[in-house]
């Protein structure tokens, strides 16, 4: 059995790490490189960095901090933010990123996924999906440009359909960002993640809702995800990554120590 992964997420805005609740009201939580180094030292399996306003503001993730992170940590990391071309992706990988993630740009141009996969291989292409549960229609819908509240818009895609589409086009992993759960620390959306797991033949990373160690256990056991991403519980030192891994191992979950 492949070991499950613990993945701290660092949302970046104006050169700082920030965190919001349900993708709104972001507050500064720290500097990029020291936080990355701290999580690597605690035992994170990899890191994800989102330049959250890049796509909405039509720019690409800032490469200067990418190279500084690469110099300081020895675990894989993924970067996202406004990546729309092969050249932009190549530059970020050259600066030290191990994977690149695309979200809003892929919704604008789905062919970007297959072009990136053809150029760099499936293994380093991650697709982020911002999924919102719409109670009125009892359905999961994909939103775009979520890093800027004023620019956020609903797309024509239902989450399940987009999950299938991005796999057909060649993505290597999917991060499902459950917007309703984001930052509230009430637990992962097991129901939605389990539904997506049935459709997902590539590694699936759960994002949104972690508040306790049991939430991590439950999402691994019940939704059978490959990795669990979290932000605020790590930023605010509510959960220590090393202690979390010891707990999960004691619960019988295969985890890298």
From Swiss-Prot:
Key words, A-Z: Amino-acid biosynthesis, Cytoplasm, Histidine biosynthesis, Lyase
Keyword Magnesium in annotation: no
EC number(s) from the headed UniProt entry: 4.3.2.10
Pathway: Amino-acid biosynthesis; L-histidine biosynthesis; L-histidine from 5-phospho-alpha-D-ribose 1-diphosphate: step 5/9
A molecular function GO annotation: imidazoleglycerol-phosphate synthase activity
InterPro entries the record matches: Aldolase_TIM, His_biosynth, HisF, IGPS_HisA/HisF, RibuloseP-bd_barrel
GO biological process: one example: L-histidine biosynthetic process
Compartment(s): Cytoplasm
Keyword Lyase: yes
Catalytic site: 11, 130
Reaction(s) the record says it catalyses: 5-[(5-phospho-1-deoxy-D-ribulos-1-ylimino)methylamino]-1-(5-phospho-beta-D-ribosyl)imidazole-4-carboxamide + L-glutamine = D-erythro-1-(imidazol-4-yl)glycerol 3-phosphate + 5-amino-1-(5-phospho-beta-D-ribosyl)imidazole-4-carboxamide + L-glutamate + H(+)
One GO CC term on file: cytoplasm
Xref: NCBIfam families: hisF
Family, as annotated: Belongs to the HisA/HisF family.
Role description: IGPS catalyzes the conversion of PRFAR and glutamine to IGP, AICAR and glutamate. The HisF subunit catalyzes the cyclization activity that produces IGP and AICAR from PRFAR using the ammonia provided by the HisH subunit.
Quaternary structure note: Heterodimer of HisH and HisF.
Cross-referenced PANTHER family: IMIDAZOLE GLYCEROL PHOSPHATE SYNTHASE HISHF, IMIDAZOLE GLYCEROL PHOSPHATE SYNTHASE SUBUNIT HISF/H IGP SYNTHASE SUBUNIT HISF/H
Protein name as it appears in the record: Imidazole glycerol phosphate synthase subunit HisF
Organism of origin: Shewanella sp. (strain ANA-3)
């Amino acid at each position: 059995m492949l070991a499950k992964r613990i993945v701290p997420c660092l949302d970046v805005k104006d050169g700082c790490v920030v965190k919001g609740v349900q993708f709104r009201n972001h507050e500064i939580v720290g500097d990029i490189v020291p936080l990355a180094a701290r999580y690597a030292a605690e035992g994170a399996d990899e890191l994800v960095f989102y330049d959250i306003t890049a796509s909405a503001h039509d720019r690409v993730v800032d490469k200067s901090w990418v190279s500084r992170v690469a110099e300081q940590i020895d675990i894989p990391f993924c970067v996202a933010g406004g990546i729309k071309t092969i050249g932009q992706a190549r530059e970020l990988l050259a600066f030290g990123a191990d994977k690149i993630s695309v979200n809003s740009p892929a919704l604008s141009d789905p062919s970007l996924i297959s072009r990136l996969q053809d150029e760099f291989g499936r293994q380093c292409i991650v697709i982020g999906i911002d999924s919102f549960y719409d109670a009125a229609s009892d359905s999961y819908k994909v939103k775009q440009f979520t890093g800027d509240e004023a620019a956020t818009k609903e797309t024509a895609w239902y989450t399940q359909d987009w999950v299938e589409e991005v796999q057909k086009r060649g993505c290597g992993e999917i991060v499902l960002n459950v917007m309703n759960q984001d930052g509230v620390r009430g637990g992962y959306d097991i129901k939605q993640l389990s539904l997506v797991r049935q459709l997902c033949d590539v590694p699936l990373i759960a994002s949104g809702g972690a508040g306790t160690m049991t939430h991590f256990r439950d999402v691994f056991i019940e939704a059978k995800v490959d990795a669990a991403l979290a932000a605020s519980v790590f930023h605010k030192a509510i959960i220590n990554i090393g202690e979390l891994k010891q707990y999960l191992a004691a619960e019988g979950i295969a985890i890298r120590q």
